Amino acid sequence: HPMAQKDIGHKVPIHTLSKTADVRDFYDDWADKDQYNQDMHDWNYTGPLETVTAFEKHAASKDILIFDAGCGTGLVGKELKRQGFNAFHGADLSQKLLDSIPNGLYQQLEKVDLNMPIKCDDNVYGAVMCVGTFTFGHVKPPALDEFVRITKDEGLICFTINEAIYKEYGFDKKIAELEMKGQWTRVAFFKSDYIASKDVGAWLGLYKVIKV
């Protein structure tokens, strides 16, 4: 299977995929025959466990409504459920990945391009999780503005950003800008191992939204 040889690091052709449709097709192919989940397992992908564990320490309650942005095959949803959370919606660009999510795990699933405005009212969610989506050729920093918009006052935004694109794509500037404007405040920000066996590092950020 050609996907098995693909790496998520700089060697991947994925960082050359500029068009949204190309990224979608890449993941649609990867979703075939459960290859995505198998690769994540093989690569010891610790993103969901590590991120949800960090998030759980600061979450107001287990009943808050969570938006899982770029939910893929539902790995974050499975971890949220395992840690006692019970209300989450998922969104992803790839319909095939969405189709592979176990029934009933998420209350709502939607095919969404996170580089576009999210079709959602302001102040709906108690938290936004975005794990493994800020990487090569994917979702750009303005998505963070949308995450803030759809999150309630004092809600949490928890995300990982591939370290190779953190500065290159301008995530550092966007994060600082939101802090400077008083739209969120930092709860935690640290380096995560992410994919243990592939030597791909990521920044893990946890921010509290401030609505004046």
Language-model regions, residue ranges each:
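Core SAM-dependent methyltransferase catalytic element
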Residues: 194-212
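Conserved beta-strand signature within the Rossmann-like core of class I S-adenosyl-L-methionine
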Residues: 154-162
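A short acidic, Gly/Pro-enriched loop at the edge of an enzyme's catalytic core
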Residues: 116-128
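Class I SAM-dependent methyltransferase Rossmann-like catalytic core
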Residues: 32-46
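Conserved alpha-helix/loop element of class I SAM-dependent methyltransferases that forms part
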Residues: 45-64
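N-terminal, positively charged/glycine-rich alpha-helical extensions of SAM-dependent methyltransferases
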Residues: 2-34
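Class I SAM-dependent methyltransferase SAM/SAH-binding core
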Residues: 67-118
